[in-house]
């Protein structure tokens, strides 16, 4: 995809050290965006940024934990000062703590929400203040199709992603008068380390693709998992000029797993 209006834009990306976040960083960088890569893991983050620089891309590493609002405010100010005005924010950082509701600990519940929901709030609030002053910007939150479909052992994850989805829509409504667009990309099962950690072997992926009446899952009509690049391409579209009149939209990228509902 040759995206309109991405070259030279500064993109703040959380969770950029691996998986979907890394794919988003690489995809936007390939279109000429300048990447402010944010992640709590400094070693992995530096590897991604070094790789991008070796390819001739513009990228800088900003290690930070999205759960820490003061740290995110500080990083946002640094990016504005050292790289320039932030044009794009992509909230990707996320965690998955599976478990039946009565087996979930307080820590597991709170840890899930602190990253998947509060982390989105912290980064969005911090960055959007600068965007409001300029009356320009685009924010995309990577949610999950689990936010709209009940799943066993996924209560914490699904609920936290549902909160992030609705928060982003509310943010989009409040920021519309400032010409700031806010959208969501909701992946289904995707080939990431986080996804593979749920399965004992490759049969896990096959079962997800097939579906199961016992677990109330419909399967994936396209008969394959998403690749991180599939999600990144959807993000690219929503932050580009091609999506200039789209806001508060939830784009589901799940191979039809939620049957378009």
From Swiss-Prot:
Substrate binds at residue 144. InterPro entries: DHB_DH, NAD(P)-bd_dom_sf, Sc_DH/Rdtase_CS, SDR_fam. GO terms for biological process: cellular response to iron ion; siderophore biosynthetic process. It is found in: Cytoplasm. Pathway: Siderophore biosynthesis; bacillibactin biosynthesis. It catalyses: (2S,3S)-2,3-dihydroxy-2,3-dihydrobenzoate + NAD(+) = 2,3-dihydroxybenzoate + NADH + H(+). Induction: In response to low temperature. NAD(+) binds at residues 12-36. Keywords: Cytoplasm, NAD, Oxidoreductase, Stress response. The active site is at residue 157. One of its GO terms (cellular component) is cytoplasm. Its main location: cytoplasm. Its EC number is 1.3.1.28. One of its GO terms (molecular function) is 2,3-dihydro-2,3-dihydroxybenzoate dehydrogenase activity. PANTHER family: 3-OXOACYL-[ACYL-CARRIER-PROTEIN] REDUCTASE FABG, SHORT-CHAIN DEHYDROGENASES/REDUCTASES FAMILY MEMBER. This is 2,3-dihydro-2,3-dihydroxybenzoate dehydrogenase. It comes from Bacillus subtilis (strain 168). The lineage of its organism: Bacteria, Bacillati, Bacillota, Bacilli, Bacillales. The gene is dhbA.
